[in-house]
Amino acid sequence: MLTTAPRGTKDILPRDVEAWRYLERTMREICAQYGYLEIRTPVFEHTELFLRGIGETTDVVEKEMYTFTDRGERSLTLRPENTASAVRSYVENKMYADPAPTKLFYIGPMFRYDRPQAGRYRQFHQFGVEALGVEGPNIDAEIILLAVQILQTLGLKDLKLKVNSVGCPKCRPLHREKLQEYFRPHLGEMCKDCQSRFDRNPLRLLDCKNPHDQELAAGAPSLEECLCEECKTHFEGLKELLTAAGVDYVVDHNLVRGLDYYTKTAFEIQYAPLGAQSAVCGGGRYDGLIEEIGGPATPGIGFAMGMERVLLAIESQNLLPQFDNSIDVFVVCPGSANFTLAFKEAIALRREGMKVEFDFLSRSMKAQMKQANRLAAKYVLILGEDEVARGCAVLRNMSTSEQTEIPIQDITSILKTEVQSHE
């Protein structure tokens, strides 16, 4: 147990970190193009925030949260998602006093007690954006375009964008009645989760993963028939903007997402080659959430992207670029006589911005040269006893195998020029 990571968690090893940094860099760069600024929130919050924000009838709250009581008898929860945390920060720090919209993005670990499988972990990472303070469908379209642009920039093709309107408190009661009327005769044959949701939140019956219940849901009354004029106009406006932007989409009237705070727009981006875990991004509008947690009535929309799933997708298609993990200089010091000199020269080169390694183990010249090759060093600086006695060092260009003697006092200036010309 001591040498095994907890089930559902995974080490990100040095050989994998470069891919994560590439993914994060792409996300940050595109967020900057759209004017979104990074926010960093605590990894745990008061449990009440998620109960009220996400909804007590959701799977996340009922089954998946990591909740604990601290020494002050406070109930705290590791964040299962970050929208609730972002809007809590928005209220606490009075960001609503700033000119709208407030445009935020985040990258970080989330925690859910879920069944681990490919692309799904108990500690997982999400990238997400939130836009607060704008009611119209134009910001919905921008959010969706941002998500699509990130995935396309990473090289993913054949993405499937699904959109829907889940209505608002004015039009959902009618849809709720129609759903209960439709599902009531079949309730006995549905799964236990659906039976418990029937009275509390029948909209969630459309989100069930049970194959039998999915077949039933396919014939359920569409929310489109129940939308109020405001929601209809909003949804038509969104579709018009997506069409104008040249973004393909399909309307899926059973798309409701798994969190209770969504209103009006809901969307999901799928990447079919991932199979059962094909959803790489999902989000929607949450116009009542900020008011629900104690802030002023403020419209909002956002999405979250599962970073493990996105990495799985781009790795499966060999879309990761080649990363240059080479070093500039390896300092070879046969024997221990000149170790202090080697250490001093390595430090001087690093202070000039070069990536430098040298041998700590007093290995043979041959072993040190092998290590330089393994590290893909561009140059090797050899501080042999005979050369040092003459006030010189040997500089070897590893790509051409050319060797030259250089004065010790000129090592830094010569290598600085050589490394810059090599780039």
Q: Predicted segments — roles?
A:
Residues 1-423:
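TRNA-recognition modules of translation machinery and tRNA-sensing kinases, especially anticodon-binding
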